[in-house]
A protein has these predicted regions:
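Hydrophobic N-terminal alpha-helices or hydrophobic patches in metabolic proteins across all domains
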Residues: 3-134
Length: 134
């Protein structure tokens, strides 16, 4: 069996991004997130990548990478297994096919700068733009 290393062209990335925009959450939409990387844990494959925030996915929403939609959970100060909160932003990775959603407790707001300060630990490796939904 041969395994091919497939790279997306800029046009293919643009098409995937357009498809993903169709799945964009509504401002303040409530979502239920399954946490697979709790706050104060390490990435399962990249052992030196420490997660200072809770990070997980939304079951049933498939992102362009074929996996369930990834979400940063901000605004809580302890590890959790699940979380229900509102989506306030999308972090667009301009040099990758993935976008990350940002969720917070219902009564909370954050600025793009505050979001980037908390997700820089991982997003520093990508060219990103933050789209605020509120």
């Amino acid at each position: 069996m041969r395994i091919a290393n497939i790279r997306l062209t800029k046009e293919e990335k643009k098409m995937k991004r357009t498809d993903q925009e169709k799945k964009k959450p509504s401002p303040g939409e409530l979502v239920h997130i399954m946490i697979d990387r709790p706050m104060n844990s390490y990435h399962p494959e990249h052992k030196d990548l420490f997660y200072p925030v809770n990070y997980g996915y939304i079951e049933g929403i498939i992102a362009p990478d074929g996996e369930e939609q990834d979400v940063y959970v901000l605004g809580i100060d302890h590890p959790v297994k699940e979380f229900t909160g509102k989506v306030i932003a999308i972090i667009h990775r301009l040099n990758d096919v993935e976008d990350k959603w940002v969720a917070v407790p219902e009564d909370m707001t954050m600025t793009a700068q505050e979001i980037m300060e908390q997700v820089r630990f991982q997003e520093q490796y990508f060219e990103t733009e933050i789209e605020m939904l509120e």
